[in-house]
């Protein structure tokens, strides 16, 4: 038989709040009046977690008896499985709020929906308890709620379109009119408790994009990157290391670095189905020297490089700028940004198969390849030795000619291997190795190859750095990159990052000094507090000893009092006996006097 529960004065209770902002919540209190049998009178309670308007003492008020209930048992969750639809009480703002579990998360966390006001908040299991209704003398557990599941049902993670980005949000509830939804911003790194609620149209919402397994992204791939709590459309501009990419957004050429896990391919949600985003259309086609087609487009992924591979037979994308010679009607090669051209300077190009180059149209005179392709490296079985720069025509900044001569001939096959690496092609180099003119001819190519090996080794060494790297090692790396820069290596990015790391190390050193100061101060404060605590403990101990002594004296006095009381009782008893004897003597004395008078008054 279920045991009935009754509450009495001085019991801990929970009080239901009717205030608009606190409606639906229970707060702990001490009952300061005994309940009445009728249940109509208001009872005085003293809250344990709420203060009065002056915030100096616990809040006390008179509450209807029907809003007061006992405190549920501590083991109320024993044997209860937390599932979607379970009614629970969540500990929030110093009280227990009634809600419904709408979604189970990882690590024993749950999303709880509250009806008044409408909201969804994430809680750990230790902050939840199963909801029970109080009948007046016993607890009753209500049935689980039946949740209706849909694409945009309560507790569903969706994405909200904002300008050109998609922001993760969570659906709180569907409003009755106009197919609108109440949502709030959502991020798995925090509980979204303080997020602002928004009312949005259903056309701006879509489900969370399903995860796609992408091995790696290539240069110029159109992607979406997670930046500032939103998915933004961008283009891969560089591959830093395996699993890390440089992505730019919009018209700007500035790129930011992202992990592979923070990048996804763009997709579109149409008619309840996910589709891959269609490729950008070709815009315009022109002719270059009658034999070469130039097309304007923004190619997705590495489609541009694949077209060149298929039609020209070259292993990688060409990285030259093609210009039209106005006087001769011929095409002359312009050197790439890394300083490599063809084997020798040529005034006329030999007959070649028709090749398509993807490019943008120039504002004045001539056409050039897409600037993004210029960052790639020309692969050839024959290594260049002399490079000639040529401007397109007199209409463009006047014609200038510069000749760059390498101090050696590239004979080793390792050049092709190094120059084809993505980490080398992703940055524009102007390798000239001019300091090698001061060395012997036989050693120059070996020195240059050694510098290539050193360059890649330094990049790997930089990648493997850890937070506790000494400043001397960073300075050594900086000096090594600076030495490579003298030979034409583009080390702007590594040097910039090393400078940032050095600045961070200075900041780290400053913070460590601050921490040492704080540690010393905390140690002193702790020692001071410990001494004060020990002194207080000693005083308490002394007071306890005094209390014990006083208690001993009190006990002795009580014993003495009892003894004196016994003596007093004995004395009183003796006095009573003496009074009785005195009375008897007085009677006897009166008898003597009476007899004396009788004798005197007797007749003769």
From Swiss-Prot:
Q: Which InterPro entries match?
A: Agenet-like_dom, Agenet_dom_plant, DUF724
Q: Which CDD domains match?
A: Tudor_Agenet_AtDUF_rpt1_3 (cd20405), Tudor_Agenet_AtDUF_rpt2_4 (cd20406)
The DUF724 domain is annotated at 405-603
Coiled coil feature spans:
520-575
Cite the record's tissue specificity text: Expressed in flowers and siliques, and at lower levels in leaves and stems.
Pfam families per the record?
Agenet (PF05641), DUF724 (PF05266)
Key words, A-Z:
Coiled coil, Growth regulation, Transport
Positions of the UniProt region annotated as Disordered:
269-308, 327-350
Protein task:
May be involved in the polar growth of plant cells via transportation of RNAs.
Q: What is this protein called?
A: DUF724 domain-containing protein 2
Lineage from the top down?
Eukaryota, Viridiplantae, Streptophyta, Embryophyta, Tracheophyta
């Amino acid at each position: 038989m279920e045991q009935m529960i009754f509450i009495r004065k001085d019991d801990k209770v929970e009080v239901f709040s009717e205030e608009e902002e606190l409606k639906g919540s229970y707060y702990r209190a001490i009952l300061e009046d005994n309940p009445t049998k009728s249940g109509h009178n208001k009872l005085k309670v003293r809250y344990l977690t709420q203060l009065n308007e002056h915030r100096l003492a616990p809040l006390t008020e008179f509450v209807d008896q029907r809003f007061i209930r006992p405190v549920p048992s501590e083991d109320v969750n024993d044997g209860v499985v937390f599932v979607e639809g379970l009614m629970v009480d969540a500990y929030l703002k110093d009280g227990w709020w009634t809600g419904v579990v709408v979604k189970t998360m990882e690590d024993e966390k749950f999303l709880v929906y509250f009806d008044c006001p409408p909201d969804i908040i994430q809680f750990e299991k230790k902050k939840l308890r199963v909801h029970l209704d109080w009948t007046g003398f016993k607890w009753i557990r209500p049935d689980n709620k039946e949740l209706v599941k849909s694409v945009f049902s309560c507790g569903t993670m969706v994405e909200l379109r904002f300008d050109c980005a998609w922001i993760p949000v969570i659906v709180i509830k569907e409003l009755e009119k106009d197919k609108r939804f109440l949502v709030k911003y959502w991020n798995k790194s925090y509980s979204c408790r303080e997020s602002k609620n928004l009312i949005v149209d259903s056309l701006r919402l879509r489900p969370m994009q399903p995860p796609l397994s992408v091995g790696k992204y290539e240069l110029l791939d159109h992607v979406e990157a997670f930046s500032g709590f939103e998915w933004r459309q961008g283009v891969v501009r560089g591959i830093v290391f395996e699993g890390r990419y440089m992505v730019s957004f919009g018209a700007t050429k500035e790129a930011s670095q992202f992990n592979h896990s923070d990048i996804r391919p763009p997709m579109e949600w149409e008619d309840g189905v996910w589709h891959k985003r269609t490729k950008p259309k070709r815009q315009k086609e022109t002719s270059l020297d009658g034999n070469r087609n130039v097309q304007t487009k923004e190619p997705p992924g590495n489609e541009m490089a694949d077209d060149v591979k298929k039609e020209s037979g070259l292993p990688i994308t060409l990285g030259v700028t093609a210009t039209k010679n106005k006087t001769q009607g011929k095409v002359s090669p312009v050197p790439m940004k890394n300083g490599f051209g063809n084997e020798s300077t040529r005034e006329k190009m030999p007959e070649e198969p028709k090749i398509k180059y993807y490019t943008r149209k120039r504002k004045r005179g001539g056409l050039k390849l897409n600037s993004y392709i210029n960052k790639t490296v020309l692969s050839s079985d024959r290594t260049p030795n002399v490079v000639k720069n040529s401007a397109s025509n007199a209409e463009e900044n006047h014609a200038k000619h510069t000749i760059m001569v390498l101090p050696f001939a590239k004979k080793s096959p390792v050049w092709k291997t190094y120059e084809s690496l993505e980490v080398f092609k992703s940055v524009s180099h102007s390798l000239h190795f001019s300091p090698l003119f001061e060395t012997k001819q036989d050693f120059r190519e070996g020195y240059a190859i050694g510098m290539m090996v050193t360059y890649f080794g330094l990049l790997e060494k930089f990648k493997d750095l850890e937070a506790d790297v000494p400043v001397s090692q960073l300075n050594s790396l900086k000096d090594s990159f600076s030495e490579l820069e003298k030979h034409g290596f583009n080390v702007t990015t590594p040097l910039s990052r090393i400078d940032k790391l050095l600045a961070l190390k200075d900041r780290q050193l400053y913070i460590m000094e601050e921490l040492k100061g704080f540690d010393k101060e905390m140690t002193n404060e702790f020692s001071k507090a410990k001494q004060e605590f020990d002194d207080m403990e000693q005083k308490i101990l002394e007071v306890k000893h005094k209390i014990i002594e006083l208690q001993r004296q009190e006990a002795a006095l009580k014993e003495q009092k009892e003894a004196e009381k016994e003596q007093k009782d004995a004395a009183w008893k003796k006095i009573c006996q003496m009074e009785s004897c005195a009375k008897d003597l007085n009677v006897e004395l009166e008898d003597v006097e009476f007899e004396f008078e009788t004798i005197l008054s007797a007749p003769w």
